[in-house]
């Protein structure tokens, strides 16, 4: 029920990764990357489908060998989400996956061989309308840049990126996006800020090798949040040493917290204290697990007492305020007569939330129809 995000996004050009528009005001896309062996087609397809099930809009797949390229061909046939092929060094792999219908090539033109090889890949991308992602990483900077700067710096990452950008510019190719990732938040943020001033192309955001599920989520939220709050970024990936499904969940949570994109339920819940009249933590955890399938954006407040409960409920689509034995229920910011028994909250609140989500979804369909 809060107003739209006050963030003014950086202007950028538009590319399309399959059917997903990137840049020029398009919704910020959330993507992930498989961590299976690409040659294990069944496992890779299964993981891609699980990523898509929680909202993944683009999936990157590593294609290190020709054998993996042949597996990619079969994977592409079995999924509908746009796929990005991650390729290093061998330009022939890029040509092969282009033949097999790849939606985007993640390559660095400067490391796939001489200019003729680069030209062959770019000409193929032009012919098949395939965008390219230039991906610079603080852990793999060119040796001369390491010597020049002594260590990875924002300037070093951007100089590396601009080398690849210049190659594409010389070949009259502008359908690309760029990332300048690092595992250090300040290094990555500084590099993206510099790059945003130098080019108009879309920027793919990420804090690379961020860490395990908890620490990586925090680091990504801080780094990506800083950039997104400044209007920088057109697509995001949260890199976690965890199930890629978790990357999508965290990515959408970051966008949701900045009111950039809303997907699913935004739970507003107190950390609980001795004033709580029901088990707030247990209730919220249970509902989060049960309601992961709901995609309709909505705010649900679950507060254990009457100190902050009514205030939060008044700005929520549904709100629960703790009271002795029977807790108060709010809908659209207004108190309703019905009260819910504290000893049976989860089942009843789940039913209320699902019903509200269905009504909101129907209202959204009607509004879109009227606009059309």
UniProtKB/Swiss-Prot annotation:
[4Fe-4S] cluster binds at residues 270, 273, 305, 312. It comes from Alteromonas mediterranea (strain DSM 17117 / CIP 110805 / LMG 28347 / Deep ecotype). This is 4-hydroxy-3-methylbut-2-en-1-yl diphosphate synthase (flavodoxin). The gene is ispG. Pathway: Isoprenoid biosynthesis; isopentenyl diphosphate biosynthesis via DXP pathway; isopentenyl diphosphate from 1-deoxy-D-xylulose 5-phosphate: step 5/6. Keywords: 4Fe-4S, Iron, Iron-sulfur, Isoprene biosynthesis, Metal-binding, Oxidoreductase. The lineage of its organism: Bacteria, Pseudomonadati, Pseudomonadota, Gammaproteobacteria, Alteromonadales. NCBIfam families: ispG_gcpE, PRK00366.1. One of its GO terms (biological process) is isopentenyl diphosphate biosynthetic process, methylerythritol 4-phosphate pathway. Signal peptide: none annotated.
């Amino acid at each position: 029920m809060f107003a739209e995000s006050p963030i003014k996004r950086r202007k950028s050009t538009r590319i399309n990764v399959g059917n997903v528009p990137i840049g020029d005001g398009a919704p910020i896309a959330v993507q992930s990357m498989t961590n299976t062996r690409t040659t294990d087609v069944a496992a890779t397809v299964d993981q891609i489908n699980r990523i898509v099930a929680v909202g993944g809009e683009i999936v990157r797949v590593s294609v290190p060998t020709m054998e993996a390229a042949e597996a990619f061909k079969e994977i592409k046939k079995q999924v509908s989400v746009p796929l990005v092929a991650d390729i290093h060094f061998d330009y022939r792999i890029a040509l092969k996956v282009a033949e097999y219908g790849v939606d985007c090539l993640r390559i660095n033109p400067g490391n796939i061989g001489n200019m003729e090889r680069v030209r062959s890949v770019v000409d193929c991308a032009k012919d098949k309308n395939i965008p390219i992602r230039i991906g610079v990483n603080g852990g793999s900077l060119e040796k001369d840049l390491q010597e020049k700067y002594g260590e990875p710096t924002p300037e070093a990452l951007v100089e590396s990126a601009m080398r690849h950008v210049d190659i594409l510019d010389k070949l009259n190719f502008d359908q690309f996006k760029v990332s300048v990732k690092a595992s250090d938040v300040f290094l990555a943020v500084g590099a993206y800020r510099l790059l945003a001033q130098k080019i108009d192309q879309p920027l793919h955001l990420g804090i690379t090798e961020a860490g395990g599920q908890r620490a990586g989520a925090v680091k990504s939220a801080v780094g990506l949040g800083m950039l997104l709050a400044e209007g920088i970024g057109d697509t995001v990936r949260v890199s976690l040493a965890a199930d890629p499904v978790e990357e999508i969940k965290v990515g959408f949570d970051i966008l949701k917290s900045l009111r950039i994109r809303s997907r699913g339920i935004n739970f507003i819940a107190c950390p609980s204290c001795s004033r709580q009249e029901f088990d707030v933590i247990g209730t919220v955890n249970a509902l989060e697990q049960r309601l992961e399938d709901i995609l309709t954006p909505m705010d649900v407040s679950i507060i254990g007492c009457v100190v902050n409960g009514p205030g939060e409920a008044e700005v929520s689509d549904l709100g629960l305020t703790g009271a002795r034995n029977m807790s108060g229920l709010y809908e659209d910011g207004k108190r309703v007569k019905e009260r819910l028994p504290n000893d049976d909250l989860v089942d009843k609140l789940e039913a209320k939330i699902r019903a509200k989500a269905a009504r909101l979804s129907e209202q959204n369909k009607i509004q879109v129809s009227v606009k059309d």
